[in-house]
C-alpha cells in the first residue's frame, strides 16, 4: 500500500525573522580577490582611490549586507598593523596561508572606505592563529575608540577622525582545521576566544562577537567542537 504525503503551504506563517546578514559575503587576500579584483590602481575602471568602479557597481546591485575581512585562512598569519598608515611605508611580507607575497597596499582603512562605497556593513576577523588578546584589543581601540589613546589617536593621524564603530567581529577562522596557521583544539580555542572577547568588550561593550564553528560536517570533532567552544564562550 502506497503512502501518500501531504504538503501544506502557508505564506503568512512565520517562525522567526531571518537575519539579513545571512546573505553576507567576505573578501580575502587570496589570488585576485583583492588585488585586481576590487582594488587595482591604474586600471581604466579604477577611481581615485584605486577601487574598481565596475566591481563596486556589481556589489551594489547584489546589495550584500555585510562583508567579512581580511579572511579566511589569510587572517591567521596577518598583522593588522601592516595595513595601516602611508602605503609607501608598509612592509611587504611572506604570506603563509596561500604561499604568496603580501604588499599590504590594501589594508584596514582601504577596506572600510570600500565598504562605505558599496553600502555594506563591515565584519572584521581577528587573528587567533599567531596572535591573540593584545592585538585584538589594540585593533578595536584603533577602529572604535573616539580618541585620547595611542591607537585611536594613530587612526586620526592617518586621516580618519571619527571612529568606525564596527559592530560585528569574528574571532579567528576555521581554528579546528589542521591546515590553519595556529590550529587549536576546541578547549584551547574556546578559552582564547572567551578571553579575547572579554578584553575587546572592555574597549567597546556594544560589539557583537562570532566564534568559529566546525569547518565542515566531516571534521572528526564535528559537534563536539561546538559544544566545547560554546561552554567557554556562550
What positions do the PLM features span?
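Non-catalytic accessory regions flanking glycosidase/transglycosidase catalytic cores in CAZymes
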Residues: 1-234
Amino acid at each position: 500500500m502506497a503512502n501518500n504525503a501531504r504538503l501544506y503551504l502557508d505564506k503568512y506563517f512565520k517562525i522567526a525573522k531571518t537575519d539579513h546578514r545571512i546573505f553576507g559575503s567576505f573578501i580575502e587576500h587570496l589570488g585576485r580577490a583583492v588585488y585586481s579584483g576590487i582594488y587595482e590602481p591604474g586600471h581604466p575602471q579604477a577611481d581615485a582611490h584605486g577601487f574598481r568602479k565596475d566591481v563596486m557597481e556589481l556589489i551594489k546591485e547584489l546589495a550584500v549586507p555585510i562583508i567579512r575581512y581580511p579572511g579566511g585562512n589569510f587572517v591567521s598569519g596577518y598583522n593588522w598593523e601592516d595595513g595601516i598608515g602611508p602605503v609607501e611605508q608598509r612592509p611587504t611580507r611572506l604570506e603563509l596561508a596561500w604561499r604568496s607575497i603580501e604588499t599590504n597596499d590594501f589594508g584596514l582603512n582601504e577596506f572600510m572606505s570600500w565598504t562605505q562605497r558599496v553600502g555594506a556593513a563591515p565584519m572584521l576577523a581577528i587573528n587567533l592563529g599567531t596572535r591573540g588578546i593584545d592585538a585584538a584589543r589594540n585593533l578595536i581601540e584603533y577602529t572604535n575608540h573616539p580618541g585620547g589613546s595611542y591607537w585611536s589617536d594613530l587612526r586620526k593621524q592617518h586621516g580618519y577622525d571619527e571612529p568606525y564603530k564596527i559592530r560585528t567581529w569574528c574571532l579567528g577562522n576555521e581554528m579546528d582545521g589542521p591546515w590553519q596557521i595556529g590550529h587549536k583544539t576546541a578547549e584551547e580555542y574556546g578559552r582564547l576566544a572567551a578571553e579575547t572577547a572579554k578584553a575587546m568588550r572592555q574597549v567597546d561593550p556594544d560589539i557583537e562577537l562570532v566564534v568559529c564553528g566546525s569547518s565542515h560536517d566531516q571534521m572528526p570533532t564535528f559537534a563536539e567542537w561546538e559544544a566545547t567552544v560554546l561552554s567557554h564562550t556562550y
